[in-house]
Amino acid sequence: FKFKCCIGKSGFTNHKKEGDKKTPRGVFKLGDLYYRKDKFSKLNTKLNSIPIKKNMGWCDDINSKNYNKLIKVSKKVKHEKIFRKDNKYDLLIPIKYNTLKPIKGKGSAIFLHLTKDYKKTLGCIAIKLNDMLILLKIIKKNSKIKII
């Protein structure tokens, strides 16, 4: 399947670095679905679905042992907030880039998330809500995303 999407402001790369605003090329597994329970009550998906809590964040602090992992928000650690007001993360699937044994500085918080206007991202892939809902119906726990 192909969907119109937006990518990182600085395009694609084969050599992702933290903060470069580039989307990594490759074939990657997808993580669990994180969703806003206050906005979506029932989702048609085979993915493991986890409600987003206000204290959820994704660590992008290269000095942290939790680099590129889901964390509880803390002022001590640099992070990307998962609970947002702008609706971009109402439905969010982490792209398993640099996640198994994260290499610090190689890039973090690469997600498949929502967009309303196809504005470029900081390295994520973003699609419209209707496309995400279609995608959620067809992807499985072992599905992969190909970024070329």
Task: Show where each model-derived region lies.
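A conserved hydrophobic position in a structured secondary element of the catalytic/binding core
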Residues: 127
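Cell wall/extracellular polymer interaction/catalysis modules
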Residues: 1-122, 130-148
